[in-house]
């Protein structure tokens, strides 16, 4: 059977806006969650289970957030949720091979477990509509004007989640004939007399509704991450007539460092540490010195790439510690500027970055002031399977 998914991204998220202190203007589904937009994580959770995924929404950020995924181009959303679903269904109906089954998923639910999605699909073999849900366990009170008027029995009460699954033809027909608002598509089937089955949902399948939900979602993601550590070491000789660039900052000195790029030994060793933690080789693998494209290149570009690779793998940087080894120049006066520059390039808080210096007590090539050495240690968190 051919399975399609509608990924809804037209909602504005007014409750989230009211609770957020961040000042960001983007809708909740486009907020960054451990290095990826919320909606991208939602799409990636569905893709292994479906043949076609169709985003529904008009925000310019939608295409950017889903760039590179094997999905259909977005279709416009509607004024209300049911309008967006209907627009998506009509678009699917026009495909050369319309689906047999359709999943409808909120773009603000980024952490739906694979088993929940698969259980919904499996239940559609015997039901026209299926929703994942979790049983209500708290005591429910009904109130008026701040005063309790009733205690509602919780037996048989469930909290509905998505993706909700349906026979495609059934849901399309009901949307064409019932244009009044519903909070979800299961309610359409219920009103028309079609039984809708429930499968076990998950407490991890959190919908981003208020700002505090971001922390809960981060906790879900972090449970599936493993710590990794990377070490970097690099050396560059001094050379007359070049600027001295260290950790992205120009440092006044009589000499610069020799190298194919700008020879920023601090950034080079930090890149090596990051690539090592990711098990992706070293800086030379990504930016080979044999390629003249990188001749005299600002090494900031290399570090931006290394940081992007962490995020593309679904991880984040815990901390980075860079040590510069030289007799001169003195690093201390520039260390804070270096920290801030590295943090900016890696898109992390400066509190996660350390830059310090030491000497070799006038021993060896650094003691003879023939060059500068640098070491770096990084700690990152990435998914257990190493995939985004």
Curated annotation (Swiss-Prot):
Q: What is this protein called?
A: Bifunctional enzyme IspD/IspF
Per its UniProt record, what CDD domains does this chain match?
CDP-ME_synthetase, MECDP_synthase
Which HAMAP family would you find in this protein's record? IspD (MF_00108), IspDF (MF_01520), IspF (MF_00107)
Entries under Gene3D superfamilies matching the protein: 2-C-methyl-D-erythritol 2,4-cyclodiphosphate synthase, Spore Coat Polysaccharide Biosynthesis Protein SpsA, Chain A
Q: Where does the entry annotate site (Positions MEP for the nucleophilic attack)?
A: 154, 207
**Enzyme Commission number(s) from the entry:** 2.7.7.60, 4.6.1.12
> Which species does this protein come from?
Gluconobacter oxydans (strain 621H) (Gluconobacter suboxydans)
Q: Where is this region: 2-C-methyl-D-erythritol 4-phosphate cytidylyltransferase?
A: 1-228
UniProt superkingdom? Bacteria
């Amino acid at each position: 059977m051919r399975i399609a998914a509608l990924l809804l991204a037209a909602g504005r998220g007014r409750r989230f806006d009211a609770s957020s202190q961040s000042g960001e203007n983007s809708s909740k589904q486009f907020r960054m969650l451990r290095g990826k937009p919320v909606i991208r994580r939602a799409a990636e959770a569905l893709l292994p289970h479906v043949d076609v995924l169709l985003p529904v929404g008009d925000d310019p950020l939608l295409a950017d957030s889903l760039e590179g995924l094997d999905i259909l181009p977005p279709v416009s959303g509607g004024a209300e949720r049911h309008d967006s679903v209907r627009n998506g269904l009509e678009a699917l109906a026009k495909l050369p091979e319309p689906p047999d089954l359709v999943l409808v998923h909120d773009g603000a639910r980024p952490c739906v477990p694979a088993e929940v999605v698969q259980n919904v699909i499996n239940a559609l073999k015997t039901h026209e509509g299926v929703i994942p849900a979790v049983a209500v366990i708290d005591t429910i009170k009904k109130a008026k004007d701040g005063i309790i008027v009733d205690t509602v029995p919780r037996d048989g009460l469930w909290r509905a989640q998505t993706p909700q699954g349906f026979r495609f033809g059934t849901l399309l027909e009901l949307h064409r004939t019932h244009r009044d608002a519903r909070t979800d598509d299961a309610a359409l089937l219920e009103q028309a007399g079609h039984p809708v089955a429930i499968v076990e949902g998950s407490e991890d399948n959190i919908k981003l509704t208020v700002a505090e939900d971001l922390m809960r979602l981060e906790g879900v993601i972090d449970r599936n991450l493993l710590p990794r550590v990377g070490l970097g070491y690099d050396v560059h000789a001094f050379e007359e007539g070049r600027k001295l660039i260290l950790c992205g900052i120009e440092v006044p000195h009589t000499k610069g460092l020799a190298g194919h790029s700008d020879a920023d030994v601090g950034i080079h060793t930090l890149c090596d540490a990051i690539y090592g933690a990711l098990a992706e080789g070293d800086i030379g693998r990504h930016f080979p010195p044999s390629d003249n494209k990188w001749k005299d290149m600002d090494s900031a570009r290399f570090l931006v790439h290394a940081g992007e690779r962490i995020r593309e793998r679904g991880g984040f940087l815990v901390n980075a510690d860079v040590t510069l080894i030289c007799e001169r120049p003195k690093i201390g006066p520039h260390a804070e500027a270096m920290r801030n520059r590295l943090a900016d390039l890696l898109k992390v808080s400066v509190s996660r970055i350390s830059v310090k210096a030491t000497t070799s007590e006038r021993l060896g090539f650094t003691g003879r002031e023939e060059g500068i050495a640098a070491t770096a240690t990084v700690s990152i968190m990435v998914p257990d399977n190493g995939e985004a």
